[in-house]
Amino acid sequence: MQNQRIRIRLKGFDHRLIDQSTAEIVETAKRTGAQVRGPIPLPTRKERFTVLISPHVNKDARDQYELRTHKRLVDIVEPTEKTVDALMRLDLAAGVDVQISLG
């Protein structure tokens, strides 16, 4: 795989799960002899929701909720066949969304 790069983006609501999954990916790639750039923390997306507590009156009574989406980026430069094989067999946490692109 000459002049190839694997870019892995991880998304999730729990930053500890994302950091743990990122560490597994980096350790697997380094063990198989590939160069790793990252993990690079990307900006966290914060969604805020305001909900009225009372169904009829009391407009001032509200609850506010926040949903944070944490993101990480890992680049694997010059991957070997063993690296791709090991990454395909890797079992990550259920709360982490993984997007893989070749470039």
Swiss-Prot record:
Pfam families noted in UniProt: Ribosomal_S10 (PF00338)
Q: Which domain of life is it from?
A: Bacteria
UniProt-recorded Gene Ontology molecular function terms? structural constituent of ribosome; tRNA binding
GO BP annotations, alphabetical order: translation
InterPro entries per record: Ribosomal_uS10, Ribosomal_uS10_CS, Ribosomal_uS10_dom, Ribosomal_uS10_dom_sf
Q: Which UniProt keywords apply?
A: Ribonucleoprotein, Ribosomal protein
Q: Show the GO cellular component annotation of the record.
A: ribonucleoprotein complex; ribosome
Quaternary structure note: Part of the 30S ribosomal subunit.
Question: What function does the entry list?
Answer: Involved in the binding of tRNA to the ribosomes.
Q: Which protein family is named in the record?
A: Belongs to the universal ribosomal protein uS10 family.
Q: What is this protein called?
A: Small ribosomal subunit protein uS10
Source organism per entry reads Shewanella amazonensis (strain ATCC BAA-1098 / SB2B)
